[in-house]
Amino acid sequence: MSNVNMDFEQAGELKIGQVGIATLRIRTLNVPRLIQEMSDRVTRAPKLFRRTAVILDFGELPHPPDLTTAKALVDGLRAANVLPVAIAYGTNEIDLLSQQLGLPLLSKFRAHYERQEVAAPPPQSTPPINTGRIQHTTVRSGQQLYAEHCDLTILNTVGAGAEVIADGNIHIYGTLRGRAMAGARGNAEMRIFCRDFQAELIAIAGRYKVLDDIPTELRGKAVQVWLEQNQIKIAALD
């Protein structure tokens, strides 16, 4: 079984969401580097990332950026054809920063961090994965198929520009030419299985790889995709 590992550290971790909005989690406040990383993503996969909506998450930084730095980041991302639409992580400082930048602060992130500051709630159990959903026909370009709280099995092709999403695993018995996202609610144990692998994008629990990141020797092969130590792994099943 061949196994491909392409690990590298980035200043910003981009996670793909369920509704076409990505979250850019800022790990290192290096504005030129962050802008260059996003510009590289747009260059490698313009159909996926050009003018994509992005939520900025400064929650991993010890301190939020000052207004000048944050504005330079927002302006630089826009120049790179990436569109910041909101800010995550709702501390009072971030709330003020969002007002100064004219970007909304997402209420769900505000509530999450305010609860953490008061008292950490008991961990919530992951909803059980129910009986899977089966798709018999081709998923065509522009279509999106979502299997909530269950696995998704596709007995046909996922066309280029199509998107299949599941909270559980994804099994594709035809060709995958579009995008496949398993573990959509954050379950990193989920996997993608595909008989003919030619994907535009694959993601598990928000971590992703695009076509240019996938070795050519795996294209057209039967593969499985999983997450290990927050890195996407791809292995041939032949």
Curated annotation (Swiss-Prot):
GO biological process: cell morphogenesis; division septum assembly; regulation of cell division; regulation of cell septum assembly
Keyword vocabulary terms for this entry: Cell cycle, Cell division, Septation
Pfam families in the record: MinC_C, MinC_N
InterPro entries, A to Z: CAP/MinC_C (IPR016098), MinC (IPR013033), MinC_C_sf (IPR036145), MinC_N (IPR007874), Septum_form_inhib_MinC_C (IPR005526)
SUPFAM superfamilies to which the protein is assigned, alphabetical: Cell-division inhibitor MinC, C-terminal domain
Xref: Gene3D superfamilies: 2.160.20.70, 3.30.70.260
The keyword Nucleotide-binding appears for this protein: no
Transmembrane domains' residue ranges: none
Family statement: Belongs to the MinC family.
Cross-referenced PANTHER family: SEPTUM SITE-DETERMINING PROTEIN MINC (PTHR34108:SF1)
UniProt subunit comment: Interacts with MinD and FtsZ.
HAMAP family per UniProt: MinC (MF_00267)
Function: Cell division inhibitor that blocks the formation of polar Z ring septums. Rapidly oscillates between the poles of the cell to destabilize FtsZ filaments that have formed before they mature into polar Z rings. Prevents FtsZ polymerization.
Name of the protein this chain belongs to: Probable septum site-determining protein MinC
Species of the source: Xylella fastidiosa (strain M12)
Gene: minC
